[in-house]
Amino acid sequence: MADQANQPTVLHKLGGQFHLRSIISEGVRARNICPSVSSYERRFATRNYMTQSLWGPSMSVSGGINVPVMQTPLCANAPAEKGGKNFMIDFMMGGVSAAVSKTAAAPIERVKLLIQNQDEMIKSGRLSEPYKGIVDCFKRTIKDEGFSSLWRGNTANVIRYFPTQALNFAFKDYFKRLFNFKKDRDGYWKWFAGNLASGGAAGASSLFFVYSLDYARTRLANDAKAAKGGGERQFNGLVDVYRKTLKSDGIAGLYRGFNISCVGIIVYRGLYFGLYDSIKPVVLTGNLQDNFFASFALGWLITNGAGLASYPIDTVRRRMMMTSGEAVKYKSSLDAFQQILKKEGPKSLFKGAGANILRAIAGAGVLSGYDQLQILFFGKKYGSGGA
């Protein structure tokens, strides 16, 4: 098999961004290739939301999935040939695409975060009783805060796209050259290790600059206005999150959970590529080898499987975020993991995972429709935001 880091297969494209998707993107893709194709060639573009909210090798577990679309390949020049103007159009349209998809999935995203972090909210007295499930969380949130509150924290999530894309564009080529291992030349394990190292390094580098926005988004989304608590919120907006956190905890408060987030990037990539290379040769054989729907199904299972397996890491990092400004904090990510297991049980590490999968489906449909509108009005599909 050819070097999959440089020549991604359909299944790799299905993998897309991880749910920390929510955090790491492959960045702006250079459109400088005009492939030679027959009239029967199919091109499918797929991105994953899931784990978008977590991390991505790029699920990006963030990100979303574009429902497969057959279309004639469109030729475009490289950014250097197109000039800065057209590059900025691609960049901005990618931002619009990200804003549309993230905004559409924001209600489910907020419910996911509320369910995931409800135990921290109960401990701090900001939630009177636990949620009974996704439907109960929706009902109570709308009843106590109003329908528009389902989008609380979405602004920070949308803003985060632009610096993430710019940083990924800057970092991805550097680390790709630094860890330039090829599967057919250097062997599987060197390629695998290089993939983890380059993805982890690029992801951590980008994450360092945008982590505070993810922190702010998490705190705003979990700032419930319970009717029984008098309807008072902890934060009045994005700027207020920064102001109060810096006052109580300093810079460290904005980066609580950063280390385990970087670990999550590597864990997800290891699970994703490990599962891909182990399962694909066994399952996609014979007539299924070039079957798109079989590849789609396997890709969906692998990305969600890797996302669910690494979901506890996302829970730990977000639970650590929730302690900034509070009197009692976890000593470390390991301490947080141990305390959650001891006091709440392993099930607590997976709270909100169901809503996370629903968010992937919702974002996929909206992003697919938006891409088709771009083709209809502009004659091409601009970059989609999966960060």
Swiss-Prot record:
Reaction catalysed by this enzyme: ADP(in) + ATP(out) = ADP(out) + ATP(in)
Keywords: Antiport, Membrane, Mitochondrion, Mitochondrion inner membrane, Repeat, Transit peptide, Transmembrane, Transmembrane helix, Transport
Locations listed in the record: Mitochondrion inner membrane
Record's bilayer topology term: Multi-pass membrane protein
UniProt: ADP binding residues: 160, 172, 317
UniProt keyword Transit peptide present: yes
SUPFAM superfamilies: Mitochondrial carrier
Transit peptide: 1-77
Gene3D superfamilies referenced in this protein's UniProt entry, alphabetically: Mitochondrial carrier domain
Transmembrane segments: 87-114, 155-179, 188-208, 258-279, 293-313, 353-373
GO annotation, biological process: mitochondrial ADP transmembrane transport; mitochondrial ATP transmembrane transport
Regulation of this protein's activity per its record: The matrix-open state (m-state) is inhibited by the membrane-permeable bongkrekic acid (BKA). The cytoplasmic-open state (c-state) is inhibited by the membrane-impermeable toxic inhibitor carboxyatractyloside (CATR).
UniProt-listed InterPro entries: ADT_euk_type, Mit_carrier, Mitochondrial_sb/sol_carrier, Mt_carrier_dom_sf
Extent of motif Nucleotide carrier signature motif: 317-322
Gene Ontology molecular function, alphabetical: ATP:ADP antiporter activity
Solcar repeats, residue ranges: 85-178, 190-282, 290-376
GO cellular component entries: mitochondrial inner membrane
Region (Important for transport activity), start-end ranges: 317-322
Highest rank taxon of the organism: Eukaryota
Family, similarity comment: Belongs to the mitochondrial carrier (TC 2.A.29) family.
Function (record text): ADP:ATP antiporter that mediates import of ADP into the mitochondrial matrix for ATP synthesis, and export of ATP out to fuel the cell. Cycles between the cytoplasmic-open state (c-state) and the matrix-open state (m-state): operates by the alternating access mechanism with a single substrate-binding site intermittently exposed to either the cytosolic (c-state) or matrix (m-state) side of the inner mitochondrial membrane.
Subunit structure: Monomer.
Domain notes per entry: The transmembrane helices are not perpendicular to the plane of the membrane, but cross the membrane at an angle. At least 2 of the odd-numbered transmembrane helices exhibit a sharp kink, due to the presence of a conserved proline residue.
PANTHER family the UniProt entry points to: ADP,ATP CARRIER PROTEIN 1-RELATED-RELATED, ADP,ATP CARRIER PROTEIN, MITOCHONDRIAL
Name under which the protein is recorded: ADP,ATP carrier protein 1, mitochondrial
Native organism: Zea mays
